[in-house]
Amino acid sequence: MAAAMGTATGPDRNDALEELKIYGRDPKNADPIFTANVRRSTASVSNSLYLTIVIKGITMLLRYAFHTTSSETARAALRVIANAMLLKPETRQMFVSKGYPARACEKLKTDNWDDEFLFSRILFLSTYGTDIDLKALIEDCQLAEHIVNNLERHINLPSDKQKQKLDPMEEMALGETLKLMFNVTHFCKAKMSAFTPAVSHIVSLLWKQDSSDAKPLEPPFSPLVNSLLNLDLQADQSQLSLYPENDPNKVTSRILHLLDRGIRAYSENDLETVVTPVVSLLSKLYENAPREVRQRMKESLLPTGEDRQAVLGRGDSLPSVLLKNSTNPTAPALRDAISHLLFDLSDKDASKFVENVGYGFASGFLFQNNVPVPASLSSSLSTGDASGNQRPVNPITGQFLDEQKFANAPEMTEEEKEREAERLFVLFERLKKTGVINIQNPVEKAVQEGRFEELSDDYVEELD
């Protein structure tokens, strides 16, 4: 390496590393990069330094990244390493085994967006499939402190409206820092409290810029939401940031706004991964919120009197859209998160849950979670309308009874009634065999009680 460094100028080194980064995007053409220390290479390259780097493998790259005085050379090497760690998981353990996580933690103390992005990304990738000691990095290398300080730097920048030109690396660096914090708090829960000071910074960053109409949860909003999920929201320091005394509903209103826009903007393929964390965060916020905030969340997320003008889940309000997705077959995690949130908003009371969303939406959740269906559930419930008047509600659909509309279908003929009775008989028998519920076929019950009379084929009903 010394000979190569002596014979190559800084620009030559950087050009070689840039070329290596391009080769490194395809593992098929760059196996030597992904080894710890390669002796020879068949790579056909003209640059002698490029050949030296390939021969030495990732060991040489780590030296360039961490033991050079040129920041430009170090960043070029870090980009190659980051690509290698992304494409070849075995290189992550090489990075850890050689003791570089501690050095990377030290490098997080920076005021350069490129450095923050690269070191955060490499540490983030090293949390997968390695024996990295995150606890030691937090205790001995100030990992949590550096992450929190970097988040604070993003707050101190001018807002969108004040910036003349946005630096794309600033946003990318923020995203990698948030992803790193999420993984560290996920894999090292014992040291979660070290990141509590980050809550106030994350809250501030929620207002750093406006979300887009097409993708309201694109970075930084999705990473900001995700990062809060693993933090201690019960801590006094967190409570002051999440429910400020002068406006306790401020944060939850922001998250509700993101949910309202996000659940409408994304296709079914993206709902599961993008929107589910927002719903999960609202559950955590509700769990730790003061009474005033809880009440506001209930008013925003539970069906209103206006929603009950029709069968619940058929309108365009946020509660209606949530109910629709609570039975979404293509997004199982989202539908479970929504049902749990609505159950929490119902004070985890099965009777209130049925009253709020209707038995049609509540039954599946109650059954899956072994929550007994309330025995006192009456055939009709009542709830307040927009003016506060109590009106009877269909317990299955959640709609006001006086708003129900029935189709003007002609009365069934005797033959149609017989076919329908036979169909119901078969369905009851199938249901009984499943063992899911203990039910008796009404025809069988009628026979046992002597209320069933078999008529002859020539029977004619006499009319008065």
Walk through the language-model features, giving the residues of each.
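Residue-level signature of the C-terminal ends
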Residues: 23-27, 45, 84-88, 98, ...
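Intrinsically disordered, low-complexity regulatory regions
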Residues: 1-4, 8, 14-20, 348-350, ...
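Elongated alpha-helical scaffolds that mediate protein-protein interactions in large eukaryotic proteins
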Residues: 1-118, 125-149, 163-170, 186-197, ...
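Amphipathic alpha-helical segments within extended alpha-helical solenoids and repeat-rich scaffolds
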Residues: 32, 39-46, 50-54, 58-65, ...
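Extended HEAT/HEAT-like alpha-solenoid repeat tracts in very large eukaryotic scaffold/adaptor proteins
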Residues: 12-19, 77-80, 118-122, 166-184, ...
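Intrinsic disorder
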Residues: 7-10, 68-71, 113, 168-171, ...
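Eukaryotic scaffolding regions of large macromolecular assemblies
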Residues: 233-404
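Acidic, Ser/Thr- and Gly/Pro-rich intrinsically disordered linkers and low-complexity segments
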Residues: 1-3, 149-172, 206-217, 256-273, ...
